[in-house]
């Protein structure tokens, strides 16, 4: 087996990051690789499809019950799922109280100190991407994750989040050695989505690792708390995830330091593809009805 690779999946909330990452990791496990998933999202949904569970008990919740994280054993926080994938969720505090990023820092330190990274080929961090606080940036900042894969779509805010995450990677690239592995486009069936994803990847100086087509079988599998790889292994969609896993596996050492763009450049790109029209400043703030009346 190859030496340990530490990767991370970042992306805008609701983009399908956890679903995409779990299917990709299930495919990597199917290929014979030994996997550890570290969920870094307060929703604690980064391992549910691997474990067939609603939500795994988190390190922070177990530490609170035990007294402190030092009172925990590795076996208490780590669960074994599909294809022997090891699963851990960092968790976060109650809503409105404390820093959710604290769970990420506490968890990774605990796992390192207790030998969780031994005898594995991949550690994968599944990280909330809308929030740029230090806790969530920790896998990047502390050189825990060496390859970042950004899950996005052709929607403007998903691309905006991808660009913001690239800014975070750029900030720590020289001090920590983290690199952008590429973009993964999770299709939302928006206009010219593939073209936009490829164009954004080009502007960021990276590659579109894979374009994952939209398929209802993903939702069917999720309702049963399963990956498509396990639920429908012979399906076309399962093969897409296998292809994505193969691309990630063959991408080791090929990451780049990204070249983020400005908001104006992002809007210009949308205009170039006809998604946004050039807006006259006099039209800003006008409703569709008001604009129709002006042009009548």
Swiss-Prot record:
The modification ADP-ribosylarginine is found at residue 102. Keywords: 4Fe-4S, ADP-ribosylation, ATP-binding, Iron, Iron-sulfur, Metal-binding, Nitrogen fixation, Nucleotide-binding, Oxidoreductase. It comes from the Bacteria. Its cofactor is [4Fe-4S] cluster. It catalyses: N2 + 8 reduced [2Fe-2S]-[ferredoxin] + 16 ATP + 16 H2O = H2 + 8 oxidized [2Fe-2S]-[ferredoxin] + 2 NH4(+) + 16 ADP + 16 phosphate + 6 H(+). The keyword Chaperone does not apply. GO terms for molecular function: 4 iron, 4 sulfur cluster binding; ATP binding; metal ion binding; nitrogenase activity. Homodimer. NCBIfam families: nifH (TIGR01287). The key enzymatic reactions in nitrogen fixation are catalyzed by the nitrogenase complex, which has 2 components: the iron protein and the molybdenum-iron protein. This is Nitrogenase iron protein 1. It comes from Azorhizobium caulinodans (strain ATCC 43989 / DSM 5975 / JCM 20966 / LMG 6465 / NBRC 14845 / NCIMB 13405 / ORS 571). The gene is nifH1.
């Amino acid at each position: 087996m190859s030496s340990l690779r530490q990767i991370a999946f970042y992306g805008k909330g609701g983009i399908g990051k956890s679903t995409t990452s779990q299917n990709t990791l299930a495919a990597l496990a199917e290929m014979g690789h030994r996997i550890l998933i570290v969920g870094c999202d307060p929703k604690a949904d980064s391992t549910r499809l691997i474990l067939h569970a609603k939500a795994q008990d988190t390190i922070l919740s177990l530490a609170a019950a035990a007294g402190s994280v030092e009172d925990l054993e590795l076996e208490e926080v780590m669960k074994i799922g599909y294809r022997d994938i090891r699963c851990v969720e960092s968790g976060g505090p109650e809503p409105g109280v404390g820093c959710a990023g604290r769970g990420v820092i506490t968890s990774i330190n605990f796992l390192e100190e207790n030998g969780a990274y031994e005898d594995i080929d991949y550690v994968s961090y599944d990280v909330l991407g809308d929030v740029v606080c230090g806790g969530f940036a920790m896998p990047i900042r502390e050189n825990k994750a060496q390859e970042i894969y950004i899950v996005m779509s052709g929607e403007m805010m998903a691309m905006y989040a991808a660009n913001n995450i690239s800014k975070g990677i750029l900030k720590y690239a020289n001090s920590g050695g983290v690199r952008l592995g590429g973009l993964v486009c999770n299709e939302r069936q928006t206009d010219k989505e593939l073209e936009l994803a490829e164009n954004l990847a080009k502007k960021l100086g990276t590659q579109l690792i894979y374009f994952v087509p939209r398929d209802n079988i993903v939702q069917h599998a999720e309702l049963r708390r399963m990956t498509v790889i396990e639920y429908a292994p012979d399906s076309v969609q399962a093969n897409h995830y296998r292809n994505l896993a193969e691309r990630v596996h063959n991408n080791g050492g090929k990451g780049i330091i990204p070249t983020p763009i400005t908001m104006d450049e992002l809007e210009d790109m949308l205009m170039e593809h006809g998604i946004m029209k050039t807006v006259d400043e006099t039209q800003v703030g006008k409703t569709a009805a008001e604009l129709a009346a002006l042009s009548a």
